[in-house]
Each structure stands twice: as structure tokens, then as C-alpha cells.
Regions:
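Catalytic cores of carbohydrate-active enzymes
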Residues: 47-48, 163-280, 319, 323-352
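Conserved oxyanion/phosphate-binding beta-strand-loop segments in alpha/beta enzyme cores
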Residues: 1-4, 31-43, 258-273
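Long, charged, mostly alpha-helical binding arms that flank functional sites
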Residues: 107-176, 180, 192-199, 203
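Aromatic-rich carbohydrate-recognition surfaces in CAZymes
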Residues: 9-14, 21-29, 33-133, 155-163, ...
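Non-catalytic C-terminal accessory modules of carbohydrate-active enzymes
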Residues: 255-258, 271, 283-290, 303-453
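Low-complexity, Ser/Thr/Pro/Gly-enriched N-terminal "stalk/linker" regions
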Residues: 1-6, 31, 35, 125, ...
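Short alpha-helical "patches" and their helix-cap loops
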Residues: 28-39, 99-109, 176-180, 245-257, ...
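Carbohydrate-binding/catalytic loop surfaces
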Residues: 1-8, 48-77, 108-110, 114, ...
Length: 453
């Protein structure tokens, strides 16, 4: 790595990295996913750092002084265990391995449970750490390690992850015919939707959250950090944002946060109005979490725009931050031309475009998901696969060869009318199907699929 090895596996980092290889190496992904599930504490939280000597069922935790002393991590982060939901879902949807839900895996410190049970406890961890508005508390950090929101401050980013977790767990509960739990999930998710719309929608953006003292982070009248990137993209990814909200929020991102190097994390940078938990103020304006272009966030932005059918924007965001697209300005970018950096200095920096922290980043995996699920539109679920490309208008055709549940798929997308998204006709082995969904039972050993946009 950029300055030596770490002393273990970061929980959120590793669980997210798995997502990018599921469609390529599903068995390797499954093995690593088992490992990370075994690093979940019995109350549902994830170990902030998983030791290289990890011994499932016998580990100490952040509640133990020995863990803090050895790892340097004194507390849980709000987002860690919530990354399990999309990763488990992507694995099962890609492979059809629904039996994985019933596989028994130990918890880090004691006890054991099925994968389905692990997910229930991950949801419980967030439910047991809610703030005054009923949103998940930010704890020691959410994805943004420079936001220290504590037990009373609340994170909208984590709230959108939480909302998405409900959606995924509802699908698993329905599959398992766990009717009482499914009914409870539906009620709780409806309550969460209401409070997120009531407390987090600010007319043309979603706020970033609340401080421990109850101040709003990221509303339109804030003198600094009035617009944040991740709440906008994750409101779309989670399915919480309606069409109008999504349009306004993502337009705000495009017109205000986007630069030729990608979208900055927030704007304006912190300088004179940072609250106590806004640790990003220690960085110069435009650097790292203080309004830099965080590379991993570009992957979520690609996916969000693609889910909305905005193929032009999705591909623009991909190109802006792609290492291979910047070889004509190596003297600006500085780092290697074949890898992502953690961040690129943003428009507030006198060195805009200079990138830093090579290799130590989850960007490659997240951008892979944004490209495969988003732009190419390969979106499997428990019953089959939806084909929903979101592409630039001038792409007249493309071909995809995909291994899927033991079958070989040859997919041709034709775009004679120059559209960004949509499906006018879908054929599978010459037979026309309604919509753009291919049920698993329609697949043969060698499947020919043609989608006309």
C-alpha cells in the first residue's frame, strides 16, 4: 500500500470490495463474505478492524480494552454492518445460491447464527443506536471518517443505507416466507420513509444529518458545507427519493459539485463554521474530506445516475475520474496512470486535479458495480436478471458475454434511436418476452439475448 500494510482488514472496506468481484469470482467472493460475517459481533455491529489472526467466536471487541489497545479502534462505526446487506444480496442474486441464507456462521466474540440471522442482527444494531429524530446515530464515524456525530448526532447517509437494508431484508423474508417479520419490516420501513422525508429533505437536496446538539448539517442556508454528495446519490440508490426529489438533488450535484475531475464531496469547504465533529476542517480547502473529489463516491454517483436512466451523465462521471482518461495530464494528476487514488484535490484547492493515496481505496470495486449494474444494466435478483442499460445516446450497439448461474449469456443491446435507456423489445433465444426481465427458467446453457432500446 501507499505507506505500508495495515494491521488488519477494515470492515467496511473489505465488505464493499467483495461486491466488485462477485460476478467474476463468485466462490472467492463467498469465502471472503463468510469471513467478514464471522467478524460481526453478536449484537450486530461489525468489528472496526478485523485482525489478521481473526479467530471467529473468540475475539475481543471495542467494549474490551485489549481490542482498543491492539487495534487502535475505540468504538463502532455506524455503517460497517450495513454494507453486508447489498453484498449478501448481490452474491445471492448473481449465483441463485439462496441456501446461503441458511448457512450457520459464528459471530466474532460468541454465539453463531444463519446468514439471515446475521442480517437481522445488523438491522438491530442500527435500531438500537437511533438518535433523537429516529434516524441512525453517526457514532464514531459513518463512511466519512471525518464526521464524528456520536450517540446523539444522526447521519442521513447511514439512514439511506438503513432504508436500503429494509428493502433487501424484506425480499429475503418474503423468500423465506417469514410473514410476521416481513410485516414488521414493512411497517418500520414506512415509518423510516416518513421521517426521512420530514427531516432530511430540504427542497432541492437531502441534508447530511444532525450534530449532537441538534444542528442541521448540509441545509441550503449553511455558510459552509451546504450541499453534500453522498446523501443525494444514496437517496437514489436506496430507493427513498421519489422522481422529483431525485431529479432536483442530482441536478444540484451536477451543476454545483461536479468538476472536470469528478464531483467533490461537499461545498463550500469548512473553514470558519465547522462544528466540533466536523474533523475535515483540519485539511486545506479542496483536500480529502474537506471538499476533495473522493474517488469511491464517484462509483455511487455513476450507479445513481444510471438507475435514473441518465446514461450520458453516468458515463461522464465515469470518464472524469477514470485513471486511463487522464494520461494527457499526468503532470497534474501525479499518481500512477493505472490505479485510482483515494481522492483528487477539488476546485477550492490551488492544485485541483492532483490525486493522492494510491491503492488504499475501495474505488475500483465500487466503480465496477457502477459500470456493470449501472451503465451496462446487468441487474440480477433472486428470480432472474433485469437488463437495463443506461448508456450515452451515440452508443448504437454493444455486446456483453456473461457467465450467470452456470449458463453462458450472449447479450446484444441495439440502440437504433439513440436513447439513453429503455426497452422497446427483448428476445431470449428468438422468443420475445415482455419488458426487460429474463427469468432464470428462460435461460439455457447458451442463451442468446437481444434487447432493442
Amino acid at each position: 500500500f501507499y505507506c505500508g500494510l495495515r494491521n488488519g482488514y477494515g470492515y467496511r472496506d473489505t465488505v464493499q470490495d467483495i461486491q466488485g468481484v462477485i460476478h467474476l469470482e463468485p466462490e472467492a467472493a463467498k469465502e471472503k463474505l463468510r469471513f467478514m460475517l464471522s467478524a460481526q459481533v453478536d449484537h450486530g455491529g461489525g468489528l472496526p478492524l478485523v485482525k489478521f489472526t481473526h479467530d471467529p467466536g473468540h475475539e475481543d471487541t471495542p467494549e474490551d480494552e485489549s481490542y482498543v489497545r491492539e487495534t487502535g479502534h475505540p468504538a463502532y462505526r455506524a455503517d460497517d454492518a450495513l454494507w453486508l446487506f447489498p453484498t449478501v444480496y448481490k452474491y445471492i442474486a448473481e449465483t441463485g445460491d439462496t441456501a446461503f441464507l441458511d448457512e450457520v456462521i459464528p459471530y466474532a466474540n460468541r454465539d453463531q447464527g444463519t446468514v439471515y440471522g446475521h442480517l437481522k442482527r445488523a438491522l438491530d444494531f442500527s435500531l438500537n443506536h437511533l438518535g433523537p429524530h429516529g434516524m441512525p446515530a453517526g457514532l464514531h464515524a459513518d463512511w466519512n471518517d471525518c464526521l464524528r456525530l456520536g450517540a446523539e448526532g444522526e447521519s442521513s447517509f447511514v439512514a439511506f443505507q438503513f432504508y436500503y437494508a429494509f428493502t433487501i431484508l424484506r425480499e429475503f423474508a418474503a423468500w423465506k416466507e417469514d410473514s410476521p417479520y416481513l410485516s414488521w419490516l414493512e411497517r418500520e420501513q414506512g415509518r423510516l420513509r416518513t421521517l426521512l422525508n420530514d427531516f432530511c429533505w430540504d427542497g432541492d437536496r437531502f441534508i447530511r444529518g444532525f450534530t449532537e446538539s441538534g444542528e442541521v448539517i448540509g441545509n441550503h442556508c449553511a455558510p459552509e458545507a451546504s450541499l453534500w454528495l453522498n446523501p443525494q446519490s444514496w437517496a437514489v440508490i436506496s430507493g427513498l427519493a421519489d422522481e422529483k426529489q431525485a431529479g432536483l438533488a442530482m441536478d444540484n450535484v451536477y451543476h454545483r459539485l461536479n468538476t472536470e475531475y469528478g464531483a467533490i464531496l461537499m461545498d463550500p469547504p469548512y473553514h470558519a463554521h465547522a462544528f466540533d465533529g466536523a474533523l475535515a476542517v483540519i485539511y486545506n480547502a479542496g483536500v480529502k474530506e474537506n471538499a476533495g473529489v473522493f474517488s469511491q463516491s464517484q462509483g455511487w454517483l455513476i450507479l445513481a445516475e444510471a438507475l435514473l436512466g441518465h446514461g450520458e451523465r453516468a458515463f461522464t462521471y465515469f470518464k472524469e475520474n477514470a485513471p486511463s482518461m487522464q494520461n494527457d495530464r499526468a503532470e497534474i494528476r501525479k499518481i500512477e496512470p493505472y490505479c485510482y487514488g483515494q481522492f483528487t484535490e477539488g476546485k477550492a484547492s490551488p492544485h485541483a486535479g492532483r490525486s493522492h493515496v494510491h491503492w488504499l481505496t475501495g474505488t475500483a470495486s465500487t466503480v465496477m458495480v457502477g459500470c456493470v449494474e449501472g451503465i451496462l444494466g446487468m441487474r440480477p435478483d433472486l428470480g432472474g436478471i433485469k437488463i437495463a442499460p443506461s448508456i450515452p445516446k451515440d452508443w448504437k450497439a454493444l455486446e456483453i458475454w456473461k457467465d450467470f448461474r452456470g449458463k453462458k449469456l450472449h447479450i446484444r443491446v441495439e440502440n437504433p434511436s439513440g436513447k439513453e435507456t429503455g426497452c422497446a423489445k427483448l428476445t431470449v433465444n428468438g422468443e420475445e418476452l415482455p419488458g426487460n426481465y429474463v427469468p432464470a427458467e428462460a435461460l439455457t446453457e447458451n442463451t442468446e439475448i437481444v434487447l432493442t432500446m
